[in-house]
Amino acid sequence: MSDKGELMEEIMEAKVMWYPDSKKITQMDQFRNRVNRNLGLRLANYNELYQWSVEFYPEFWAEFWDFSGIVYSKTYDEVIDRSKGIADVPEWFKGSRLNYAENLLKHKENDKIALYSAREGKENIEKVTFAELRRDVALFAAAMRKMGIKTGDRVAGYLPNCIQTVEAMLAAASIGAIWSATSPDFGVNGVLDRFSQIQPKLILSVESVIYNGKEHCHLEKLQHVVKGLPDLKKVVVIPYVLPKEKIDISKIPNSMFLDEFLATGKVGDQSPQLEFEQLPFNHPLYIMYSSGTTGAPKCMVHSAGGTLIKHLTEHILHGSTTSSDVIMYYTTAGWMMWNWLITAVATGASLVLYDGSPLVPSLNVLWDLVDRLGITILGTGAKWLAVLEDKGLKPCNTHSLQTLHTILSTGSPLKPQSYEYVYKHIKSNVLLGSVSGGTDIIACFMGQNVSVPVYKGEIQARHLGMAIEAWNEEGEAVLGESGELVCLKPLPSQPTHFWNDENGSKYQKAYFAKFPGVWAHGDYCKINPKTGGIVMLGRSDGTLNPNGVRFGSSEIYNIVEAFVEVSDSLCVPQYNKDGDERVILFLKMADKFEFSKELLKRIKDAIRVALSARHVPALILETKDIPYTISGKKVEVAVKQVIAGKEVPHRGAFSNPQSLDLYRNIPELQNF
């Protein structure tokens, strides 16, 4: 049998792990019935609804605008100009006026818990009701306005995943300021590579965090970050681990503690009123960052309306999320899954914020939270599930998990054996939804779906409105074969533009260079023609993504090549048969210097301090040469192919093609 035949046979034998309850009317069913009624259609199932949603995408988004109950002060004149394609970055819902924060804070069940906040090593769980959340956001916003923050200004968070982070973001959004965040595990270089491009007026941070049983002081890093941001007007420090009295911020210019900052927003003893600037649908909400593969990270600007409506399709339709849900996603505040999670509060659901290691003080820390708080939807990383499996953990024997109906996974492809592990040792009737998308769209192209079965090893379905295909190198759609993940039609949550990209050339190069007019996402995938499910096959570019921590090789180069001992370096991913990724760093030594354990330690320490522990390569090896193109570009992708045992046929583009042979059959890279 041919390889292709074996592949197709394997696809046809996909194993069902979960079936939707045919007796349960989901919000997806309600939406499909509404579309049929309003438009005189007879869409019988999810596949027919999906096909309609991508063919008639303006009608789909218009129907969902009404179905979702989006709050607006002025409705739209036009959903989208149909004559414009995805590469034209068309404006959505032209003429409408709304506010993202107003949509998240619209629920009037004042005493209902909006946010829970749990932290590593802390027994007490903080709680904030919807009424308290509105009050706190109003106070944050008043203080921001008092210091001069206005529509379009940038507000930055160098913060953990906690209540104050959510409140500060919503306050910025209520004004029309643009929020941008990195997590505390980023080093000074990593933060300045991002924030120096957008020049925030205000930065909020904490004095220290707890991770993996250790306290990590944050103030020295913050001090260096502040020095690198000349346009910064104010620094607000939130006491997080230590009480205010034990924190010295005297060395940080223009700094004050949170309570002092919020006090400036009060008028006498009165709490300020919550005000929402009414802004165009395309008004900027977030600046997110690319990994920085080819230089400084690209700054992706995401709109308030686009982020809101795309996230709501995923929460309301694909997840059937309601106000009775309690949702937790294990994420930092700098990862797009945080932004995705926070939008869910618009459904009236309660959110659980967790800061710390998911494995400390015990491997059961997240399962303990599920039972303690009645979590219904738990989001995590594929690697975490694999670790629990390797450790032999069986939560079904130790925990009730009665409330849990959905487990979501992202960050890296979910291995087929992880499906078996979840259904055998965690919960047999849970929806296991592997999701995939990216920072580029601040959302998912595909993922969980309450209307279709879960098949082992597959993402359930392409999301509504997402015209996704797998294309071969000739630009032809393929089924049952690996191909480049592409998107053919506009979507509301694609970036409106890149910051500091006036003519849009960086934007066009990032997504449309490979297939003109078609979004190429940089992932390889395979679409099952029988089930409609998708198997992700890893990155197709030079981005590094070990354990779901996405970053670019240039971030490593900037640090390593500052060492006098190193003349050049190359950083590439290596994949094992299960799709797990690790980072390999090759060093070319400068003349008269030797490769040594002492040098390795200093390099690892430097990467850990400047970026984070999660950026440290799994292996650092010596090499005698590094391949370059004739035009002088370092060639990572070719080395990635060689260490995977593949041939590099087009050697004519290399200035030193013989260097590729140095990376073949390296002993340290075998048996991964």
UniProtKB/Swiss-Prot annotation:
Reactions it catalyzes: acetoacetate + ATP + CoA = acetoacetyl-CoA + AMP + diphosphate
EC number: 6.2.1.16
GO terms assigned for molecular function: acetoacetate-CoA ligase activity; ATP binding
GO biological process: fatty acid metabolic process
SUPFAM superfamilies according to UniProt: Acetyl-CoA synthetase-like (SSF56801)
Keyword Lipid metabolism among UniProt keywords: yes
UniProt organism field: Xenopus tropicalis
Main location (coarse class): cytoplasm
Lineage of origin: Eukaryota, Metazoa, Chordata, Craniata, Vertebrata
Keyword terms of this UniProt record: ATP-binding, Cytoplasm, Fatty acid metabolism, Ligase, Lipid metabolism, Nucleotide-binding
One Pfam family linked to the record: AMP-binding
Family membership: Belongs to the ATP-dependent AMP-binding enzyme family.
Its job: Activates acetoacetate to acetoacetyl-CoA.
Compartments where found: Cytoplasm, Cytosol
GO cellular component: cytosol
InterPro entries to which the protein is assigned, alphabetical: Acac_CoA_synth (IPR005914), ACAS_N (IPR032387), AMP-bd_C_sf (IPR045851), AMP-binding_CS (IPR020845), AMP-dep_synth/lig_dom (IPR000873), ANL_N_sf (IPR042099)
Protein name: Acetoacetyl-CoA synthetase
